[in-house]
Design a protein with these regions (language model features):
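Charged- and aromatic-enriched interaction segments used to assemble
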Residues: 1-12, 19-21
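An acidic/polar, Gly/Ser/Thr-rich interaction patch typically located in mid-to-C-terminal regions
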Residues: 14-171
């Protein structure tokens, strides 16, 4: 069961507030190394942004030349298989946009739940598209039901990306 769309503009508006922030330090390609005790060799694993499955349509950065490479700090998460650790951290850091906001009282028919995908319509802006619900707070009073949310995405909308609305090198 898909969540209803969140809409900022027009007659179908159901978003009260919506604030999008761009994470300029992510996404990054990640590299991690560890010592293999069996043969005393160095094992290195990497995860590239271009290999990740996107939440939305188009990656916010054009290619590998726009993405930096970072080495993970040794020791963090050592109990986890190295490739899994690198992939997990790359996925976490790939969230280029974080949005916070709230739905209009009585206007949104759905119940937002974490880890669900929702489509957000913000006109023709590049930040329209698919988001993942990261966090939601439900407030129920005698007269109102309110939802405040945090959404994340690692992509921009295809229509905005192809329209020239995104200045080159900005996203």
């Amino acid at each position: 069961d898909a969540l209803p769309e969140l809409v900022l503009l027009g007659a179908e508006r159901n978003i009260d507030t919506f604030d999008v922030r761009f994470n300029a330090q992510g996404p990054v390609n990640l590299v991690a190394s560890t010592l293999s005790f069996s043969d005393k060799s160095v094992v290195t694993r990497q995860s590239r942004v271009r290999d990740l499955t996107l939440v939305g349509e188009v990656p916010p950065l054009a290619g590998d030349e726009d993405v930096g490479t970072e080495r993970l700090r040794p020791g963090a998460g050592e109990g986890v298989e190295l490739q899994h650790r690198v992939d997990r951290e790359a996925r976490r850091r790939s969230r280029a946009f974080t949005a916070t906001g709230s739905v209009r009282l009585g206007c949104y028919a759905g119940v937002l739940r974490p880890f669900r995908r929702v489509t957000v319509k913000l006109g023709t802006t590049p930040t329209s598209g698919s988001y993942l619900v990261e966090r939601v707070v439900h407030r129920l009073t005698r007269s109102d039901y309110a939802q405040e949310f945090t959404l994340v995405t690692d992509a921009v909308s295809e229509t905005a990306a192809g329209s020239g609305l995104i200045p080159a090198g900005l996203f």
